[in-house]
Amino acid sequence: MQGGTPEAVKLGRWSRDFYLGQRAEIGTDSGFTRQGYLLPCFSEAEVAAAHDRIAMQQAEGIPVRWAGPDEVSELNPTMAPGVTLGASYCAEDGYITPPRNVAAYTAALLGTGVHVAERTAFTGLDGTDVRTSRGTISAGLVILTGGPKLAAVGALAGIRIPAGGARHQVAVTEVHPAFADTPMVFHLPAGLYWRPEEGGLLFGMSNPDEPPGEDRSVDEPYLAQMRARLAKLVPLTADLRLRRVWAATIDFTPDHLPIIGPALDRDRVFVASAGGAGMMWGPAVARATADVALTGASEITDVSMLGLDRFDESGRSRLAADPIALPFPEKTT
């Protein structure tokens, strides 16, 4: 819930509440683990920015607070003592299990009679008729999604969408009992985060110099660089083997904010993008887009500023970028 703007905070809070009540609502859950979330600071400028964010987040009703260096060590004993100047902390935050999340949604869709068309390519739109590799689907309303492929999806529909994708790497260490009850941590300046996973520690990283693209090979030199950085912060990891390492394509928008709203100059066609925060904002972005498509507005937050009309012809946004984001490329292509 520790977003960098009021809109991001509201999207994050709604998504967290959805995860908490997901089983009661749709009969499946995404394995949400409420274990807290730390954003450590390493400079006085970061401390000042954190206090400003905390004030904004508290005004939005989020139970976030400042934790000094000693308390950070208490909250996460695996971190090197005295390595930070403190951190923003919210005990109500947590994380989900991505594979379980996908399985949960799929089961819920199938259980309500939705036909999931796998291995079916989208090829374009005729009004709200959806052309696919298996024929045309007549629809009264269309919502375009696609994650890192969203710009390509938009191009097939004749719609310019400033969204991109870049390589993101994740690794999981071997098991160590010290990680079991530790909160998730996001080292914002380094684009490095970590949390417990299957008895070990999962850590993910995005290279700020990574160009947009679909490279899903593991960048071994950058992985080594991030492992060295992680070892300074979490010394236990220095001697732990890696059980799994993979790379994937993560989506992003130029201002690190979601896209929610109608396609420009199209009737009954809408666009939804979580802007690189799919697990944190995904449920709220989906609901808000559905709300806008059906009623013109959403009770989650005012999304009128999050539409495609905030971007100019070059894809530049008139909004300030959300400061709580991975270091995505400056341009989408």
Label for each model-derived stretch:
Residues T33-Y37, A166-R167, V245:
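Short Gly/Ser/Thr- and Asp/Glu-enriched loop/turn motifs at secondary-structure junctions
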Residues A231-T333:
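C-terminal catalytic lobe of FAD-dependent flavoproteins
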Residues K10, C41-A49, Y89-A107, S217-A224, ...:
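Short beta-strand to alpha-helix junction loop
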Residues M1-L75, G191-L192, P211, R229-A231:
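Dinucleotide-binding Rossmann-like beta1-alpha1 core, especially the glycine-rich loop
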Residues G68-P69, E118-T120, R244:
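Short loop/edge segments at beta-strand edges and connector loops
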Residues V175-R268:
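Active-site lid/adjacent beta-loop-alpha segment flanking the redox-cofactor pocket in flavoenzymes
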